[in-house]
A protein has these predicted regions:
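A glycine-rich (often HGG/GG-containing) alpha/beta subdomain
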Residues: 1-145, 149, 153, 326, ...
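Switch I (G2) and immediately adjacent beta-strands of P-loop GTPase domains
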Residues: 51-64, 68-72, 252-280, 298
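Short, Asp-centered acidic motifs that coordinate Mg2+ and/or phosphate
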Residues: 269, 301, 331
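Inter-motif core of Ras-like GTPase G domains
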Residues: 285-309
Length: 456
């Protein structure tokens, strides 16, 4: 394989940058661009050691000073020789060091190529490689715990145990079908049925956790809706922890959609603070209302905000009916709880089981909003030591495996021939092997690693 290199840290001004080189000649390439002060040569350095020194160009002129770390094959991330050069984190100097590595024979790595080599060299399974990417992108504790479990091989072992069991069963079924005259032990249909039921239960758990996992991993598209001047922007600022939306006593201040992400417990709310939804003759405001309605149609969660100190009017009820027809998950927020409550709760409880009182101005009611949101979305109560949130590719394989294994169980219960059962189990086992990456096509592997950043 060719020698590859890339910047493994974000390309931005910072304390340090790391340039990674991997391949058979990685250490000799490192030796040409780095001159250690503490030893004679990089090529004499043992694995898992580092040295301070000078980064130099082909003429021996100093470019920067830094630290070089050596990892020797096969005890490295990729399974190949690796050199990592840590230099100062300026954009120009980082690019300069990368160019020096390319001048000495390394090629610029593709997206995810280091982790892909780890997979191809048997250092990681495909699911573990996906766990690496999920660790990088995790935005909360549940997502990070799941990513770590996947990265350490928990999902691979769970699915691999299933597939191995069915491969053994397939071998027994094939022998029994192909050599009926031989004195072979009879296949226990009860044991086979039990194996299928156990596998289906395991797959059902993975599939059932998927929707919640996607919410925790990717966040929730959330629209804050309501009439003008009910406190939508104040609520958004409260959730963000800083002033993002302009807040005034003038109705209709927000005319465009303001979008930001906020953390609410373990959830990431992708917030859209919309223009107040009401009838207006103002052309600009009217356009803002239309945009707000489009946002509502695409939202997963709608937080409808009402002023607790003002009785509900026709426009309020029209908004409630409009969102109800969209079939969205709704939390109704009665804002300004520090003022006198004149709203009849019963009018609102027809539209949502989650009606809460808050004072966004005083930052009161955040916990109640969090509890309502988690309950409405079915989030919470996960065991951090065992819950794995599979990704879309893995779920597609799990659902396909489940379909075939369920058909095998149904065939068994209906008294069909073991030939028919064998075909279904074989298809199910193949789907499980694709999930773990043991039988994934080159196109699937390429697709997985194309989602990585360059340098990982």
């Amino acid at each position: 394989m060719k020698d590859i290199c890339a910047v493994s840290t974000p390309l931005a001004e910072g304390g340090i940058s790391v340039i990674r080189i991997s391949g058979e000649n990685a250490i000799s390439i490192g030796a040409k661009v780095f001159k250690p002060l503490s030893c004679k040569s990089v090529e004499n350095m043992a694995g898992y050691t580092c040295a301070y020194g000078k980064i130099v160009d082909k003429n021996g002129r100093e470019v920067d000073d830094g630290v070089l770390t050596v990892f020797r094959a096969p005890k490295s991330y990729t399974g190949e020789n690796i050199c990592e050069i840590s230099c100062h984190g300026g954009i120009y100097v980082t690019k300069k060091v990368l160019r020096l590595c390319i001048e000495q024979g390394a090629e610029l790595a593709q997206r995810g190529e280091f982790t892909k080599r780890a997979f191809l060299n048997g250092k990681l399974s495909l699911t573990q490689a996906e766990g690496v990417m999920e660790t990088i992108s995790a935005q909360g504790e549940y997502a990070l715990n799941s990513a770590n479990l996947t990265k350490e091989g928990r999902l691979f072992r769970l699915i691999s145990d299933m597939s191995r069991k069915f491969i053994t069963i397939l071998g027994e079924l094939a022998a029994w079908v192909d050599y009926p005259e031989e004195d072979l032990p009879e296949i226990s249909e009860d044991n086979l049925r039990e194996s299928l039921k156990n596998a289906l239960a395991g797959l059902d758990k993975i599939i059932a956790d998927h929707d919640s996992g996607m919410i925790l991993k990717n966040g929730v598209d959330t629209v804050i809706a309501g009439k003008p001047n009910v406190g939508k922007s104040t609520l958004m600022n409260m959730l963000l922890g800083y002033d993002r939306s302009i807040v005034t006593n003038v109705a209709g201040t927000t005319r465009d959609v303001i979008e930001e992400s906020a953390k609410l417990g373990e959830l990431i709310l992708k917030l859209s603070d919309t223009a107040g939804i009401h009838e207006t003759d103002d052309e600009v405001e009217r356009i803002g209302v239309e945009i707000a309605k489009k946002k509502l149609k695409n939202a997963m969660l709608v937080i409808e905000v009402f002023d607790i100190s003002r009785k509900l009017d026709e426009e309020d009820l029209e908004l409630l009916e409009y969102v109800k027809k969209l079939g969205k998950k709704v939390i109704i927020v009665l804002n300004k709880s520090d003022l006198e409550n004149v709203v009849e709760r019963s009018q609102l409880e027809k539209y949502s089981d989650y009606v809460i009182e808050i004072s966004a101005k005083l930052d009161e009611g955040r916990e109640e909003l969090q509890k309502a949101t988690e309950k409405l979305l079915g989030i919470g109560g996960y065991d951090a030591d065992s819950t794995i949130f599979a990704n879309e590719r893995q779920i597609a394989c799990a659902e396909r495996a489940r379909k075939y294994l369920a058909m095998a169980l149904e065939s068994l219960d209906m008294g069909e021939t073991l030939d028919a059962v064998t075909v279904m189990i074989d298809n199910g086992a193949n789907a499980l092997l694709e999930l773990t990456g043991e039988k994934a096509t080159e196109a699937v592997v390429d697709e997985v690693f194309s989602k990585f950043c360059v340098g990982k």
